[in-house]
Amino acid sequence: MDKFQSYLGLDRSHYFLYPLIFQEYIYVLAHDHGLNGSVLLENAGYDNKSSLLIVKRLIIRMYQQNHLILSVNDSKQTPFLGHNKNFYSQVMSEVSSTIMEIPLSLRLISSLERKGVVKSDNLRSIHSIFSFLEDNFSHLNYVLDILIPYPAHMEILVQALRYWIKDASSLHLLRFFLHECHNWDSLITSNSKKAGSSFSKRNHRLFFFLYTSYVCEYESGFLFLRNQSSHLRSTSSGSLIERIYFYGKIEYLAEVFAGAFQANLWLFKDSFMHYVRYQGKSILASKGTFILMNKWKYYFVNFWKSYFYLWSQPGRIYINQLSNHSLDFLGYRSSVRLKPSMVRGQMLENTFLIDNAIKKFDSIVPIMPLVGSLAKSKFCNALGHPIGKAVWADLSDSDIIERFGRIYRNLSHYHSGSSKKKSLYRVKYILRLSCARTLARKHKSTVRAFLKRFGSRLLEEFFTEEEQVFSLTFPRVSSISRRLSRRRIWYLDIVCINDLANHE
C-alpha cells in the first residue's frame, strides 16, 4: 500500500484515477495481485516479455487514437493489435478494477488505524464465521435464510460507486466495459449459483468489485436500522472493501431513513440478533419470535424494492427454527442440537435425577457433496470409486504424489472444524487410491505393485499438519494425540474457500 500511495499521490490528484490506465506499472500491479490468474499470461503463446510488449503497444495505440470507442455490433474477432478486441477489453477491465480498488484499500487501512485495529487478517478468515456461530447461535431461536437479489441493471452498480469514486471519467469507462462484456447479462438472475459461475469466467475481478459495492450499500442501510433499533451497538467483522463504508454512510442514511422508518423502529427492537453473509446469501438469526422474524422478512423485500429497484419474492426468504434446521454453507453443515444430560440431585435423604437438555452448536462435513466435487475434478466416479488422474500422467512421480498430498492437506485443513472426521477418512482413501491409479497408469503397471513400492511414502504425504504436530508433541501418549485430533479446530488464516469444498 505504500507503493500505491506513492504511485497515486492521492492528496494532489483528488482521486482522478483515469490517467492511471495509461501507466505501465498499473498493469504490472494488476498482474502481481493475481487478477483472474493473469489474463496476459494465460493467453496462449505469450511469456512475460511479450506480455509487457502487448501492454506497451496497447498504451501507445490509446494515445494515438481512441480505440476505446468500438461499436458493440462489430465482430468479436475484429483485429486489435493483432488480437480480438474482447481480449484487450478484458485486460483493461481488470486493470480498471485494480485502479478503483486502490483508493478504497487505502481508506480501509486508514479506517482500521483510526479504530485501533492493528491486524485484520483474523477478521478476514472464513473460519472466524464458524467460531462466531459456535459462540452465539446456541442461544438463538430463529434464522432467516436470505437469497440476496441481484440488480436488474448494471447502472445500479455503477451508481453505487458515485459516493466512493469522484472521478467521472473512470465511471464512464466502467460503463463502457459493462456494455462491452457479452456475459454481463448472466448476472441478471436471482440464482446465486448461476451468478457465482459467471464470476469465475471473464472479468471476474470487475464484477466482484461491483457486486461488493452494491452489497455494501444495502448492508450499510441494514446496519443503520439495526443500530437504531437495538440497545446494543453492533460490530462488523466483514472483510476487505465490503467494510469500508459501513460507518461512513451513516450520516447520509440518517436522512433517508428518518422519515420512512422512524415510526416503525419499535417493531424491530431485538438485542440478540446476528447477521452473516456468504456467497450471495445471508443469515439473520435472532432470539425473537416468529412474528418478529416475519417483520424483518418483509422489511428486506420492501427495502430492496424502494431503494434499489429490485423485486424480490418473499418466498425467497425462509424462516426456520434453529432447533430443527441445518445450515449448509461454506462446505459445512451447521446446526444447533439439544444435548441431553442428567443431573443427580439430593434433598434431605431423598435423591432424584433431573433431565436437562443443553443446546450445542455442531458442524459436520456433508460427505456426498464433497464426493461430488471430487467426481467433477475426475478423482473418482459419481459413486465415489477412485479413478486415475489421466491429465497428470506426464508429470514426475514425486510431483504426482506431492499434488495429491497437497490437495488432501488443504481439504483437511479447511474441514478441521468438523466434529466428525469420518468423511475426511473417505476423502483420504479416494485421493490416495487415485494417486496410486495415476502412477500405475503412467508406468503401465498394477495398483498393487505401486502400493507395495510407495506404500509408506504415500502415507507420509497424506499426513496432515495437525497429525504431525500431535505426534511430535505426544510421541508416547497416542490416546491423547488421537483425542486431540478429533476435536474441532478453527484456523484464522483461511481467507478463501477451497474449490473442492465449495458446494454452492
Swiss-Prot record:
Descriptive protein name: Maturase K
Source organism of this protein record: Guizotia abyssinica
Pfam families assigned to the protein according to its UniProt record, in alphabetical order: Intron_maturas2 (PF01348), MatK_N (PF01824)
GO MF entry, a single one: RNA binding
Compartments (UniProt record): Plastid, Chloroplast
GO terms under cellular component: chloroplast
Keywords from the named record: Chloroplast, mRNA processing, Plastid, RNA-binding, tRNA processing
GO biological process: mRNA processing; RNA splicing; tRNA processing
PANTHER family registered for this protein in UniProt: MATURASE K
HAMAP family: MatK (MF_01390)
Function description: Usually encoded in the trnK tRNA gene intron. Probably assists in splicing its own and other chloroplast group II introns.
Top-level taxonomic group: Eukaryota
Chief localization: plastid
Protein family: Belongs to the intron maturase 2 family. MatK subfamily.
InterPro entries registered for this protein in UniProt: Domain_X, Maturase_MatK, Maturase_MatK_N
